[in-house]
Amino acid sequence: MFCASSSPITSPLYPKAYKFSQTKSNSKRFSSLRASLPVSDNKLLKFEYTPWLIVGLGNPGLKYYGTRHNIGFEMIDHIARATDISMNTIQSKALVGIGSVGEVPILLVKPQGYMNFSGESVGPLAAYYQIPLRHILMIYDDMGLSNGVLRLQPKGGHSQHNGLKNVTEHLNGCRGYPRLSIGIGNPPGNMDMKAFLLQKFSPLERKQMDEGLEQGVEGVKTLVEEGFSDSISRFNLGQKYKFHKV
């Protein structure tokens, strides 16, 4: 089921329906979000900009650091560095950083429950900050794409990804939220899928992935400022063919 982005969204933990309001008088939480930004940025921000909730999926703890299944966390770290956002707040079982891309407020999120319970952070945060479905960007690992290849989409299914499944459940079954898929390739031979997901990258894979993450930062910044414009179409096309030799 795809839910219209203009419809109110509810969360099982925050059952009251909500709809993001762009007026100052009706958005106290957005006011506090804006106030938490650096003073120099506050002078530039305008209330017509709807904030983005940008969530990277992964598992907490050093055991999972640098593994394929945690690439969503790595993408959030790259975005945080590029935008000078400190991931220094704990809210709704998640590590949260608040800042902006240009004039657009963003919240960077790394759920600290395990992957399969990511929705327990996403649902409450979306409800609390009144983020519309179309501005909830999920970042996750995708075995359907080659290692280091990225793709931005306005909506889609869960692709058998348990983290996405749980997020969708906590957004009332609505799948119409944007997502950034980060390719990690497929397990070689008869390798167990779980073992593959929890394995670290080879040196070549790591190089490809690091380049992809840097490109992903630019893709996310473009999405936040322009939406799903022609620039995103060009981004996806460039990603699709970047390893093809002419």
Swiss-Prot record:
<comment type="similarity">
    <text>Belongs to the PTH family. CRS2 subfamily.</text>
</comment>
<keyword id="KW-0508">mRNA splicing</keyword>
<comment type="subunit">
    <text>Part of large ribonucleo-protein complexes that include group IIB introns and either CAF1 or CAF2.</text>
</comment>
<protein>
    <recommendedName>
        <fullName>Chloroplastic group IIB intron splicing facilitator CRS2-A, chloroplastic</fullName>
    </recommendedName>
</protein>
<dbReference type="GO" id="GO:0008380">
    <property type="term" value="P:RNA splicing"/>
</dbReference>
<dbReference type="GO" id="GO:1990904">
    <property type="term" value="C:ribonucleoprotein complex"/>
</dbReference>
<comment type="function">
    <text>Required for the splicing of group IIB introns in chloroplasts.</text>
</comment>
<dbReference type="InterPro" id="IPR018171">
    <property type="entry name" value="Pept_tRNA_hydro_CS"/>
</dbReference>
<keyword id="KW-0820">tRNA-binding</keyword>
<keyword id="KW-0694">RNA-binding</keyword>
<feature type="active site" description="Proton acceptor">
    <location>
        <position position="69"/>
    </location>
</feature>
<feature type="binding site">
    <location>
        <position position="64"/>
    </location>
    <ligand>
        <name>tRNA</name>
    </ligand>
</feature>
<dbReference type="GO" id="GO:0006397">
    <property type="term" value="P:mRNA processing"/>
</dbReference>
<dbReference type="GO" id="GO:0009570">
    <property type="term" value="C:chloroplast stroma"/>
</dbReference>
<feature type="binding site">
    <location>
        <position position="116"/>
    </location>
    <ligand>
        <name>tRNA</name>
    </ligand>
</feature>
<dbReference type="Pfam" id="PF01195">
    <property type="entry name" value="Pept_tRNA_hydro"/>
</dbReference>
<feature type="binding site">
    <location>
        <position position="114"/>
    </location>
    <ligand>
        <name>tRNA</name>
    </ligand>
</feature>
<keyword id="KW-0687">Ribonucleoprotein</keyword>
<keyword id="KW-0809">Transit peptide</keyword>
<keyword id="KW-0934">Plastid</keyword>
<dbReference type="GO" id="GO:0004045">
    <property type="term" value="F:peptidyl-tRNA hydrolase activity"/>
</dbReference>
<dbReference type="InterPro" id="IPR036416">
    <property type="entry name" value="Pept_tRNA_hydro_sf"/>
</dbReference>
<feature type="site" description="Stabilizes the basic form of H active site to accept a proton">
    <location>
        <position position="141"/>
    </location>
</feature>
<keyword id="KW-0507">mRNA processing</keyword>
<dbReference type="GO" id="GO:0000049">
    <property type="term" value="F:tRNA binding"/>
</dbReference>
<dbReference type="InterPro" id="IPR001328">
    <property type="entry name" value="Pept_tRNA_hydro"/>
</dbReference>
<feature type="transit peptide" description="Chloroplast">
    <location>
        <begin position="1"/>
        <end position="34"/>
    </location>
</feature>
<keyword id="KW-0150">Chloroplast</keyword>
<feature type="binding site">
    <location>
        <position position="162"/>
    </location>
    <ligand>
        <name>tRNA</name>
    </ligand>
</feature>
